[in-house]
């Protein structure tokens, strides 16, 4: 989706890491876009308090990160652009909750901002059940079916030349998640010569 939208000059796209300060990261990434940086400089917007650019003479520095983003979004709207933010492997952590709370404010102010989040069902469920983030209940959701156990087992049998018993064990570990299927396959491929499936489980569990 993001790759297709990037082809449209009216769209700006930003990918955020949910384990970092997402508001700060969003501001930094928007500011680093050449077309937007020029607009902010010409508008004499001073974001130096957040390490974005330099102090501007006769301009009061903006000292609140939400205000920084509101000014950025105002200029994005003014220049007929739209902003898509994507977040992969989202969890119900403090950074995500703060970001989504601010995102609700930006929506109410009618800024052209859009959010695409992906993650495990249980993580999305926990997040939308937060009383401060009720708008997520109304947000469109696409539920992806888990990968077929039989198909995963066959892939592992064909690629690694495993017997059905070993392939069954690996397929069960993925629980049908595409990411888990890829990670487990990668770890087994890298360690197959001198490690068993049980040997790689501690590293797999950390992913």
Language model segments and positions:
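Switch/connector loops and helix/strand junctions flanking conserved nucleotide-binding motifs
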Residues: 22-26, 123-128
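A short hydrophobic beta-strand->loop->alpha-helix junction that borders the nucleotide-binding pocket
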Residues: 13-22
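P-loop NTPase Walker A phosphate-binding motif
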Residues: 1-12
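Conserved small helical "lid"/interfacial subdomain of P-loop NTPases
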Residues: 139-167, 173, 184
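A short helix-turn-beta junction within AAA+ P-loop NTPase domains corresponding to the substrate/partner-engaging
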Residues: 11, 129-146
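Conserved Walker B catalytic segment
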Residues: 58-122, 129-132
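Amphipathic alpha-helical "lid/sensor" segments that cap RecA-like P-loop NTPase cores
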Residues: 161-207
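Conserved Walker-type P-loop NTP-binding/catalytic site
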Residues: 30-72
């Amino acid at each position: 989706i993001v790759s297709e939208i990037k082809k449209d000059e009216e769209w700006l796209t930003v990918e955020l890491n949910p384990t970092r300060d997402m508001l700060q990261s969003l501001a930094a990434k928007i500011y680093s876009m050449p077309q937007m940086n020029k607009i902010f400089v010409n508008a004499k917007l001073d974001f130096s308090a957040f390490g974005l650019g330099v102090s501007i003479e006769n301009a009061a520095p903006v000292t609140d990160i939400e205000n920084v983003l509101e000014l950025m979004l105002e200029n994005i709207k003014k220049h007929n652009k739209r902003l898509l933010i994507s977040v992969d492997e989202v969890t119900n952590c403090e950074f995500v909750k703060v970001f989504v709370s601010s995102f609700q404010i930006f929506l109410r102010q009618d800024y052209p901002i859009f959010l695409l989040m992906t993650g495990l069902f249980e993580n999305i469920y926990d997040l939308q059940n937060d009383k401060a983030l009720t708008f997520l209940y109304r947000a469109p959701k696409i539920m992806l079916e888990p990968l077929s156990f039989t198909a995963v087992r066959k892939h592992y049998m064909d690629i690694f030349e495993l017997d059905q018993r070993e392939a069954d064990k690996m397929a069960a570990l993925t629980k049908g998640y595409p990411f888990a299927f890829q990670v487990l396959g990668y770890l087994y491929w890298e360690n197959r010569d001198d490690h068993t499936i049980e040997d790689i489980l501690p590293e797999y569990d950390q992913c």
